[in-house]
Amino acid sequence: MPSRLRKTRKLRGHVSHGHGRIGKHRKHPGGRGNAGGMHHHRINFDKYHPGYFGKVGMRHYHLKRNQSFCPTVNLDKLWTLVSEQTRVNAAKNKNGVAPIIDVVRSGYYKVLGKGKLPKQPVIVKAKFFSRRAEEKIKGVGGACVLVA
């Protein structure tokens, strides 16, 4: 239901007239807009708008990150990357197809030569092989396949 009087008429006789008792309807006591960000409004800008002032450095386009990232796995842990069932089946089929172990799928890039391999051929796929790892894999009749 619309009121009979306008808001102005209702507020007549009230000291503050809807403009509060602190600021008292004065113009722009803190400056207009973002004024004083480095001076009297410094605390607010530092807390709620960090990085608003100052310069930012240059962009490095086509930056190659993680060039040295190369997780490694040793030969003695190689068979833990596939299921036990795969290893048992490979041991039974002496003249069958050699199982393929893709170390990149397990999150490793390089195969190192620590430890011994069981005397059964295996095909290992990796991005890098150490010299000793390659010798040991080929020593049991396996093969090293380089993948990108």
UniProtKB/Swiss-Prot annotation:
Sequence positions bearing Phosphoserine: 68
PROSITE patterns to which the protein is assigned, alphabetical: RIBOSOMAL_L15
Chain positions with (3S)-3-hydroxyhistidine modification: 39
Example of a GO cellular component annotation carried by this entry: cytosolic ribosome
Residue stretches in coiled coil: none
Region (Disordered): 1-37
Chain positions with N6-acetyllysine modification: 47, 55, 110
Signal peptide segment: none
Protein name: Large ribosomal subunit protein uL15
Record gene name: Rpl27a
